[in-house]
Amino acid sequence: MKVVGQGLNRVDAYGKVTGEAKYSADLEPRDILHGKVIHSTIANGLVKSFDLTEALKVPGVVKILTCFDAPDCQFPTAGHPWSVEAKHQDICDRRVLNQRVRLYGDDIAAVVAENEVAAAQAARLVKVEYEEYEPIVTVKAAMAPGATPLHPDIRKDNVIVHSHMTMGPKDFTFEDGLKQAKEKYKEEDLVEINEVYDTPRISHCHIELPVSWAYVDVNGKVTVVSSTQIPHIVRRCTAQALGIPIGKVRIIKPYIGGGFGNKQDVLYEPLNAFLTMSVGGRPVRLEISREETISGTRTRHAIEGVCRGLVTKDGTVLARQLDAYANNGGYASHGHAICANCGNVFKDLYRDRLGAEIDCWTVYTSSPTAGAMRGYGIPQAAWFAECLTDDMATAIGMDPYEFRMKNCMEDGFVDPANGITFHTYGLKKCMEAGKKYIHWDEKRKEYANQTGPVRRGVGMSIFCYKTGVHPISLETSSVRMVLNQDGSMQVSMGATEIGQGADTVFSQMASE
């Protein structure tokens, strides 16, 4: 190959370094209006009424729109391609503005004004009457018998989805493994581990805040210029949210100042489109503050992993179990896929000689909505699996490195979930190299038997990352290449440049 594999300068490097690259906010027209979202001040309840009297007196206010003015159209926000199978489609549980409040900071109204100051001042003066309910903050409370459903129109309880998977015999359970082990081994040769591990919520904290601006062109098409990772999906969901044909919506994605998965969700583009349509098509700018981003966009999932492990005293892993409980917050977003992906990856690195049992629950709560974030459930899976692995090794007094070498997957393993054979793995070679380069044995001896409040240690972990969600979605992709008269080429594709170098790599591929 002449171009692919060469060390070339990034195609977007010069523009970003010199400041010539244009982001969403750099492209706004001069006469633009400013939008401000009014968020709920309760975590669970119902909006009864608004008093807009004082807010409408603020000079410069053009319009105030409430949940009672917005289209009654539910739409999904996850950045997934459309599935033709109803059971695999993303969950439609959101409206442009929501009367039913499901989290503190829910979007209930919006102000459009001539300037930011007027919009912010008017938003503070809007008075809201609520019918307030007890917040359901934890997964345990949300799953308790008799818990009030946050989305009674689409769910009879607060469980968004329950995913079950096994390794080994069909319908294997951890209790089956215990029974089989006690028949095969002496009881004193078996060690059972029961632990609970947690992962916290994390905000993406991308430098560029979620920002967009929208207008209606002379042909009646609403155009949204947005810092989004998923322009094609935003187009579909915006049309669905407003109840208009997809052909009446256009999404423009300029340069993006970071996303990390938060912008792999439909955020405020539908609302921005609704605002401009409500003021005769005049351009409306909508920027979300850092505080609003943390409470009102997406976070990483907080997941509780209830784990069990069964191991022999010679270091042979017999069975493992994971019950994962994901706090998804007020809306579904990507949650139905992420927790399932977490459970799916938990089973992939180690050989459970008898089998593994995995159950994952994604649950609505009265808290900020969790969605896509780098790793997509795999960081949580790695934390659960590796903590359990270390605890099993510690329980039998075995070196964690040797324990992993004895139990990790090997070439030739056949995944029972999909029948795929592992022809190349390289994990053991990787661990051997890591052990050598960090001087594992020497440091283990050096750091043994320490005392005092400050101590040094050496540890290790392994993880895998995989892609593809068949049969839920085929995730097909396509590209359109147009050769110009001068020999240059225009390439249209679905991959979004968010700093990972996609534009450069695909330019190389097109050149080749």
Where would I find each of the regions flagged by the language model?
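Short, surface-exposed loop/turn segments at secondary-structure boundaries that line and modulate
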Residues: 65-106, 140-154, 233, 250-272, ...
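Short helix/loop capping segments that flank catalytic or ligand/cofactor-binding pockets
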Residues: 26-27, 46-48, 74-75, 119-122, ...
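Glycine-rich loop/linker segments at domain edges
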Residues: 6, 12-15, 86-87, 158-212, ...
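Alpha-helical support elements that line or immediately flank enzyme active sites
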Residues: 37-71, 109-130, 212-280, 337-348, ...
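Helix-loop-helix junctions that connect adjacent transmembrane helices in secondary transporters/permeases
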Residues: 148-242, 408-488
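Short coil/turn connectors at secondary-structure junctions
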Residues: 31-34, 58-62, 98, 105-108, ...
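Beta-strand segments within the central parallel beta-sheet cores of soluble alpha/beta enzyme folds
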Residues: 67, 247-254, 281-291, 318-324, ...
